[in-house]
């Protein structure tokens, strides 16, 4: 899809399909809309009245106009003017893209209000278009593409914004990579595949890559990570991908993503009704980490970023860790495994220790960590825990810019009492109440002084149905937040 911005107004544009975004309220055909209505032979007014279109958020209407200067007309509602933000533009662009597909449009022009500035507006619209039109059909034997495809999109009245559009295309390439990694089944994406993906990113964009094999992980004392990996016939891969700017970096950051390419639960096996068939998505944190790496490598900020993915499976075999085993993490702390299905935090423990040894300025980890977080916050909102208020504020600002939702959660130290072990330093799970909080408190034991933030993304990494800029399946959450955070440190 070729997306470009232009000074052309909606009154002078001619072509296949014109899409307008209109705010909520009684829509008056006056001024520019009156001129457009005249140009379209009264069809704009007819469409508004016949469909009772009032501009409510999520509403839309479309019609074919015949053989005039514009052949199809699309209207989308933007909601209340006071609530306009960049996410309004993304959602409007996504709705327009889907309607244009239904109308079999090949050339599309979009007229939406400016939010912030023209550059930010063009970028947000581009994101909405690209993310809504992405369809992962790799595993279909018969492709469902029929008829015309959307080939060109003009963003009207925004002037030349090629740089902003290119930036959004680069960010979306990372989101799409994350989506496709999560969408793929566990017999396609394994720890080896994760390593190959990291190699491709490193080769294409000039990043450094260090893949720690099992023996190297053993030499570093990564007993928690390797305890999870023991049962799988596929060897673990501890991935360390590094982006460095050409000059002196302004900051050094680390992103650590949980990378369980399949989670059977281990000997505490996931039973009927547990959603075991969806556990290909348990590497959503690692997928987003690699997606962010791909985007950041293209954007080239003056920030050094370390992307860390402890990749393995959690399987069942004669070698599997047992409930009751004691593991020693790479910082020397001992863990009594009272549930083998709380394995993600074990892999992250060694990932966090590794990250802190790099002497970075801040560490963010992200993981599909707990069902408890989904119960608390639902499918659309991720949980956020942090030891540092400034870092938490940075991530929340980055998320707001991306239109991705997080909710700050407490690190209630009292709850860690339930994770204390009589024979080790800690257990890997606590009592059922506050399960997402105790999981975050567990991770906190593997950070000393570096500002640290944990994201539990178990809900938003997947959507069972079309939702905003996402189609059903993997969402690529929260690649755009991570990228915005890194760029804000630039």
UniProtKB/Swiss-Prot annotation:
Catalytic activity: Release of an N-terminal amino acid, Xaa-|-Yaa-, in which Xaa is preferably Leu, but may be other amino acids including Pro although not Arg or Lys, and Yaa may be Pro. Amino acid amides and methyl esters are also readily hydrolyzed, but rates on arylamides are exceedingly low; Release of an N-terminal amino acid, preferentially leucine, but not glutamic or aspartic acids
GO BP, one annotated term: proteolysis
Keywords associated with the record: Aminopeptidase, Cytoplasm, Hydrolase, Manganese, Metal-binding, Protease
Active-site residues from the entry: 270, 345
EC assignment: 3.4.11.1, 3.4.11.10
InterPro entries: Leucine_aapep/pepB, Macro_dom-like, Peptidase_M17_C, Peptidase_M17_leu_NH2_pept, Peptidase_M17_N
Superkingdom field: Bacteria
Amino acids binding Mn(2+) 1: 263, 341, 343
UniProt keyword annotation of Transmembrane helix present: no
GO molecular function: manganese ion binding; metalloaminopeptidase activity
CC annotations in GO: cytoplasm
Residues the record lists as binding Mn(2+) 2: 258, 263, 282, 343
CDD domains named in the record: Peptidase_M17
Cofactor: record remark: Binds 2 manganese ions per subunit.
Localisation per UniProt entry: Cytoplasm
Coiled-coil stretches: none
HAMAP family membership: Cytosol_peptidase_M17
Function of the protein: Presumably involved in the processing and regular turnover of intracellular proteins. Catalyzes the removal of unsubstituted N-terminal amino acids from various peptides.
Family named by the database record: Belongs to the peptidase M17 family.
Record-given protein name: Probable cytosol aminopeptidase
Organism name: Microcystis aeruginosa (strain NIES-843 / IAM M-2473)
Source organism phylogeny: Bacteria, Bacillati, Cyanobacteriota, Cyanophyceae, Oscillatoriophycideae
